[in-house]
């Protein structure tokens, strides 16, 4: 055995014995000073071999001995805090990995609040704030040859990353703020940067090193859900350091390459979220997606196809990263193909939420913006096939946003694969989502860090607007200036007062018909367009003024209006036709409702006419369920769907007559003498009137349920006509709600729940929304006692289905409607229990 090594062992053993037994301050300080020589930084250093043996073999034992002696009395043996400072220096100046593990071991083994526990926690706080964690990671980056080194590193890794949880469990309410996760992980990110700077210095000096431990620290932190805290500090500094240094770029590439496979997704997601631009992401990741299969799967599939919660700038940064290098651009083309394949899948359209479809559409548009003309021409046929399939299944959707997505993406794709041909144009609402999607189709200018030319910029999609050139519009509004003294100035009429023509009315040769039969004749046989238009515009008011005459020809008039086509350009033709049809239905509800419901399942009707029937039934039912003073507004049009009964509108014609002067004086005097502590909005009570819809609700409701499962030659509710089925479910829900507290509400509710149960697993989102609304309507309209007495089995079945929808449905609106229905069920149960409980 080497005598020098044996001497170190003997010295350490003797020192531990003295520290354990002696109470003499001078003796203790002398012993600690002797041991401090092995850590360096003294005037009398030891041999390098002795220093290495002490650090690798004996240092942990010395630290444990120092921890065991920690007490207020032991530290006060030396006045002035000299012993305490010397005691702390062993933890702060020695090998950081062993000091850190001994500190963590001591804190975890100390039970309950105590002086030793808080002193060790404060020392650990000092250890962190003085940069010792960076020194710890720097030490792990050096080459290691010990057999036990992997196990030691694993222990060290778990303690470094799990420090906030471990300290929180040990200190509980006495925990220090530095150990909170929101404070610790940004500090750890700063320490990672310092460790990487040391690695760069090693490489510049020609020394060998590894960033594997730092990669594992980063991966474990991201797996535990703290990637935002650590990367918010790490990424901005690496962005600056890698801007002008290829060595720093290589270190960053190596850092992410050595992240364990189980942590690749978390690290990549965090980096993509934190990187401000594609060039920054390219400097941090390099060609990782080309070398690493797991990284390629995460970037090209998981972040784009399986997840959809990421922001639009993140998608742009991710796809821009793929477009910046020639080795990665084939992956961009592959991503576009896979996105379009998913976008064109009818099953995906039915079973994925709208948010995910919008996310995929944005990714497609960003891909198209990054690809050049030659690259797109190579895959032109595949793009065209996917586009046609996607447009077809989206235009068949019942949801307007889904249809709009199909139109916009199809316009952009067609403009890119056929730039020389006629542009494909659709008519859709110009809302915020449409503008955002069209903006994504135009690529941003390539940055200076782009390593590959992106080819010719794609032509922006032609978004036709009413005003093409603002300058031309200005020119058309402002007359051209004329030189002074011109003839136009002499002939000007500006000094004359303009004639008021605001009250002028258009003179018509045909007068408005005065009788219902004249209107029917004019609408069916008249060739005079002015008379036809006048009949249509005056029909609604005439129906309300002549109810008896209307009932004589109500069915005939409803038939004429249902089949009426626009012969000439009439403003608001559809609204006028619908208002007149609603007025006829309100005037003679039983006969007209029988006719309309029988025609809903009839042959040779368009989908538009069938949906018109449903709209008219709902509007008429809404009008019948209101007081007459609200529904008979012959001069102001029919009731608008969704309009609530307002007390101000319920005042009758007689109630609106001006009061006499003496009554006004008396009321004013009373009002001035009255002291009021609070005053609400003035309201007039509505006079009680019967609900006219209650007697005819069955004629509106039950015929619509009879043949929904019987396909016709041109009409199949359970097949392709899902839009009409969705409108039918919403119509039935509205009729059920308007039949509240009526005698027919119970059989209506039972029939509606059976209808819902038959269609509860329908794939169309719009249909499921209507079914869920129908359940809520039943719960609101049928009395509680009748619900639980007549429909207990149906409610139990509906409850289990609602719970399943609230948890698993892909559509957010469906989940929300299911939760509301469940809350209504709970409220009904609580109401029943409170009413059945004995009163004290």
Curated annotation (Swiss-Prot):
The modification N-acetylmethionine is found at residue 1. It comes from the Eukaryota. It is found in: Cytoplasm; Membrane; Nucleus; Chromosome, Telomere. One of its GO terms (biological process) is protein stabilization. Residues 488-497 have a biased composition (Acidic residues). The modification Hydroxyproline is found at residues 374, 419, 422. Residues 443-497 are annotated as: Disordered. GO terms for cellular component: chromosome, telomeric region; cytoplasm; cytosol; membrane; nuclear body; TTT Hsp90 cochaperone complex. Its main location: cytoplasm. InterPro entries: TEL2_C_sf, TEL2_Regulation, Telomere_length_regulation_dom. Component of the TTT complex composed of TELO2, TTI1 and TTI2. Interacts with ATM, ATR, MTOR, PRKDC, RUVBL2, TTI1, TTI2, SMG1 and TRRAP. Component of the mTORC1 and mTORC2 complexes. Interacts (phosphorylated form) with PIH1D1. Interaction with PIH1D1 mediates interaction of TELO2 with the R2TP complex composed of RUVBL1, RUVBL2, PIH1D1, and RPAP3. This is Telomere length regulation protein TEL2 homolog.
